[in-house]
């Protein structure tokens, strides 16, 4: 809430800024040099995990509209859950806004 002198000006109702989600798989990066042998995770009978991919996610900071970019490795079902949360009431803050409003 903003405190100040009374005015006769009526502001339009607050609307959330439009949110654009760019969720797409990221191509795997080929590494050069020595690599540690990959271990297979223990098998889980009766539980089929979804195939995990790396997704690049860009969301605006809720404080200053700066674009925040990060990658996540998850299944398509989980990235859709993240998308649903972002379209509802989950907001991200950049480190500057977190310090100022934390």
Curated annotation (Swiss-Prot):
Zinc finger (unnamed): 61-97
Any GO BP annotation: symbiont-mediated suppression of host innate immune response
Keyword DNA-binding in annotation: yes
Keywords: Activator, DNA-binding, Early protein, G1/S host cell cycle checkpoint dysregulation by virus, Host cytoplasm, Host nucleus, Host-virus interaction, Inhibition of host innate immune response by virus, Inhibition of host interferon signaling pathway by virus, Interferon antiviral system evasion, Metal-binding, Modulation of host cell cycle by virus, Oncogene, Transcription, Transcription regulation, Viral immunoevasion, Zinc, Zinc-finger
Pfam families on file: E7
Signal sequence annotation: none
Database matches in InterPro entries: Papilloma_E7 (IPR000148)
Chain residue ranges for the region called E7 terminal domain: 2-36
Intracellular or extracellular location(s): Host cytoplasm; Host nucleus
Major site of localization recorded for this protein: host cell
Post-translational modification (record): Highly phosphorylated.
Gene Ontology cellular component list: host cell cytoplasm; host cell nucleus
Region (Disordered): 30-52
Molecular function, one GO term: protein domain specific binding
Motif (Nuclear export signal): 79-87
Keyword Signal (UniProt): no
Record note on quaternary structure: Homodimer. Homooligomer. Interacts with host RB1; this interaction induces dissociation of RB1-E2F1 complex thereby disrupting RB1 activity. Interacts with host EP300; this interaction represses EP300 transcriptional activity. Interacts with protein E2; this interaction inhibits E7 oncogenic activity. Interacts with host TMEM173/STING; this interaction impairs the ability of TMEM173/STING to sense cytosolic DNA and promote the production of type I interferon (IFN-alpha and IFN-beta).
Free-text function comment from the UniProt entry: Plays a role in viral genome replication by driving entry of quiescent cells into the cell cycle. Stimulation of progression from G1 to S phase allows the virus to efficiently use the cellular DNA replicating machinery to achieve viral genome replication. E7 protein has both transforming and trans-activating activities. Induces the disassembly of the E2F1 transcription factor from RB1, with subsequent transcriptional activation of E2F1-regulated S-phase genes. Interferes with host histone deacetylation mediated by HDAC1 and HDAC2, leading to transcription activation.
Domain notes: The E7 terminal domain is an intrinsically disordered domain, whose flexibility and conformational transitions confer target adaptability to the oncoprotein. It allows adaptation to a variety of protein targets and exposes the PEST degradation sequence that regulates its turnover in the cell.
Stated family: Belongs to the papillomaviridae E7 protein family.
Official protein name in the record: Protein E7
Organism: European elk papillomavirus (EEPV)
């Amino acid at each position: 809430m903003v405190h100040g002198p009374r005015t006769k000006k009526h502001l339009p109702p607050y609307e959330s800024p439009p949110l654009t989600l760019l969720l797409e798989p990221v191509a795997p990066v080929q590494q050069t040099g020595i690599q540690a042998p990959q271990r297979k995770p223990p098998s889980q009978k009766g539980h089929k995990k979804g195939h995990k991919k790396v997704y690049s996610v860009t969301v605006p900071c809720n404080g200053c509209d700066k674009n925040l970019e990060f990658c996540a490795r998850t299944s398509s079902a989980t990235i859709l859950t993240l998308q649903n949360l972002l379209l509802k009431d989950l907001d991200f803050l950049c480190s500057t806004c977190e310090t100022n409003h934390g």
